[in-house]
């Protein structure tokens, strides 16, 4: 037992100081790296001995706590810790805190017994952090622990704490500052957690703990040690001294009767360095033999109410609402990667730039689904205004948008996306797309406007990765199909009937530098390996576009049509289905290692191993709502296609707007003559005549 006549030494415990940046980094680590992994993780904090009077003894964790190689702030001491992050609140509550404390305390005890703590004194200052992060509400539950080994008896004070300037002269204090700074520089650090210290009237010397035998050679009664002390109380040392005294008692109690302790505190006020508020006192080392078993340990932090329990921090109210929305948008997506689709590459989806040509029923639904996938860059193109019939079918508009003649759809859609999620980069362009069979040569003004529209569309397609064709008419899809094919852009097309729809990806032409005989990666697969269908194993560069099945050129489809024929009349749920499938098709293509060149999946592949983590990558999805059925046909590119055939692309790339103007101002026969469709019609008619002649002969 300690001497009953002597006062007992008491310590100021650490207070955890977890920065908002730490919780943000934990959120990112949980979503992107840890996921369901509850294994302990190494983290790092620090404490400081220069705080102003009145501040608690703090151990700080910042955003850099997860980077073990990150530098510690200047003049701060690092503290190594272990993070135990649970997946559920129940697991957090039922975690065996006693076992966690015992495990950490045993590590400290082993470092003391082996002498490793003399070589690396940071091993004496370890901490635990038990956490649960509710990433939906941004509530973070945590319980902090800084394990301290307990001596079998309390530590008696031989001489009570006094300030350093009461024990040392100004000359000695200045010599101490210089000696400490020199030792730090020699070790390549700005702070040392513990050091040896001896002084007389003329000199002050300091050294590392591992040199204690040589440093205190010849001393038999008392030694002096320095402790980097984060506490600023005049009568009490900080928590780091506790484990050091256990080390001293274990290693030196047989050699020395007492230890003089300098709690080194070093702060700068108004540009002047001051260590005089450091305290120095003398304690009696317990004379006892330690058993090999780890001593009892304490260290769990009390909560705000002063009881033994965890703490909770609610960051939902203080975080930037835009950042909060951005993190929440990504939450469900990143949860997919935890267990369901670990190989999902979300960066490919989030970073893709999408151009939506058409901001009507399909455009609105496609945009909402793109946002659900976390796509941050969406651009609308449309020339229509919002009418009173639109808001019930087009979810980006409301009644007020129809007033005063209606807002431009493209601009209103972009504005609404930013209101839904401020993190999206949404733009709208109120412009027309010139079309075959719709003349633009009425005047120089209309001709010049068409030229500007074409240039604008070319620039938009050039600046985006995926082009969605979501317009009302067939001919309005022709120009973007030609431009996108020439620029080798992925095109996703969606079109509606009354109770049918088609969603397809256009074939992606080979890069221009490749010759006709060059092989894309998909072509290296042997046809017999993936099925027996006639259209099995068609690589992406051989797939057809929206116009490849046509044997006539596109023209003015609205001329001489009644109202029900001019408007898109379809079952209300059809656009939602087709819009969602269009986006899902894009995502599946992006997840395929060959992207737009991926071999097309067909209905025959439904029972085969899917080529991506998300499943099949079809060429087309044709749906029949009356039968609640979908089929996945595949079609080859047509060498006489009026949009993507080599003849059309060559003419466009050589002549540019001159060629396009001919298409706009001419009848459909111009494209048919160019591509060879006219000759095909003539040959077909001739064959029919010969067939009739043969029948008459018979």
Swiss-Prot record:
InterPro entries: Atg7, Atg7_N, Atg7_N_1, Atg7_N_2, ThiF/MoeB/HesA, ThiF_NAD_FAD-bd, Ubiquitin-activating_enz. Disruption phenotype: Leads to hepatomegaly in liver and accumulation of abnormal organelles in hepatic cells. Liver-specific knockout leads to loss of autophagy, increased accumulation of CRY1, decreased blood glucose levels due to impaired gluconeogenesis and the disruption of the circadian clock in the liver. Signal peptide: none annotated. Its main location: cytoplasm. Gene3D superfamilies: NAD(P)-binding Rossmann-like Domain, Ubiquitin-like modifier-activating enzyme ATG7 C-terminal domain, Ubiquitin-like modifier-activating enzyme ATG7 N-terminal domain. Pfam families: ATG7_N, ThiF. One of its GO terms (cellular component) is axoneme. GO terms for molecular function: Atg12 activating enzyme activity; Atg8 activating enzyme activity. A motif (FAP motif) lies at residues 11-13. The active site is at 567 (glycyl thioester intermediate). It is found in: Cytoplasm; Preautophagosomal structure. The modification Phosphoserine is found at residue 693. Keywords: Acetylation, Autophagy, Biological rhythms, Cytoplasm, Isopeptide bond, Phosphoprotein, Protein transport, Transport, Ubl conjugation, Ubl conjugation pathway. E1-like activating enzyme involved in the 2 ubiquitin-like systems required for cytoplasm to vacuole transport (Cvt) and autophagy. Activates ATG12 for its conjugation with ATG5 as well as the ATG8 family proteins for their conjugation with phosphatidylethanolamine. Both systems are needed for the ATG8 association to Cvt vesicles and autophagosomes membranes. Facilitates LC3-I lipidation with phosphatidylethanolamine to form LC3-II which is found on autophagosomal membranes. Required for autophagic death induced by caspase-8 inhibition. Belongs to the ATG7 family. Homodimer. Interacts with ATG3; this interaction is essential for the transfer of ATG8-like proteins's thioester from ATG7 to ATG3 and plays a role in the conjugation of ATG12 to ATG5. Interacts with ATG12. Interacts with ATG10. Forms intermediate conjugates with GABARAPL1. Forms intermediate conjugates with ATG8-like proteins such as GABARAP, GABARAPL2 or MAP1LC3A. Interacts with EP300 acetyltransferase. Interacts with FOXO1. This is Ubiquitin-like modifier-activating enzyme ATG7.
